[in-house]
Amino acid sequence: MKKLNFIIKCGLALLLLSFYSCESWLNVTPSDRLSEEMLFNDREGFVKALNGVYIELNTNELYGRNLTAGALDVMGQYYSVASSSHAFYNYGGLVYTGNDEKALFDNMWQKCYAVIACCNTIIEKCDERQDVLPGVYYGLYKGEALALRAMLHLDMLRLFGPVYDETSKTAECIPYVTNTDAQISPLLSAEVVLESVIGDLKTALNLLKESDPVLTDGVRNEGNSIGDNALNYRQFRLNYYAVKA
């Protein structure tokens, strides 16, 4: 009862405050939005955001383990897991109904779409802040973000979509998220998802063709003398050739 009274009092206080200073309250900038605007206020912010995406790709939920030499490879029968006490034993037997298995797939899904959301923010901000992305940087950053978005959606389709054929391709399976809205995106058919993947890759390829230094200077496998390595070590990025492959 005390908790209920507290909630009611807080609600009344907020209501009175809104009547007292509605205009000021509406003009308050949320902290996450403020941080976002500050991050993308210069080119270095875009570098940090894109680096953050690559760092998240390396977590255990994604390519640091589960989507490479972890559960996925065991499911693909690359490894033989004979001991029933092994954490990946059920994956080798194609049994995914246990709580641990469900949790792994759930974490994989959530992490993947969280990273996709970061890619979408970068793509959106590239268009909004072209003024701080001179020369090749606009095409380079937007191209990489588009390619990363396509790659992640393709892996989600491989995991959670149907075996692709003329019959199954129309079945709804996963969303293809291209915006930063906090709304639930609808499930799309495997056919539409693949069309979206190809569309993103084509756009990324066109952007990187005009901006990626890997085409003219190679991977630039050394540090820049002035300490700015944004255009160096291209072998560690989703570069033009990686997208084209």
List where the protein language model places each region.
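Short coil/linker segments at helix-helix boundaries
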Residues: 136-139, 159-196
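Membrane-proximal, proline-rich intrinsically disordered regions
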Residues: 22-71
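Residue signature of alpha-solenoid helical repeat architecture, marking inter-repeat boundaries
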Residues: 140, 147, 171, 228-231, ...
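Extended ligand-binding clefts on enzyme/binding-domain cores
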Residues: 44, 50, 59, 188-192, ...
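Aromatic- and glycine-enriched pocket-lining scaffold segments that form the walls
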Residues: 208, 219-244
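Conserved, well-structured interaction surfaces
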Residues: 86-160, 187-192, 206-208
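Bacterial Sec-dependent N-terminal signal peptides
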Residues: 1-31
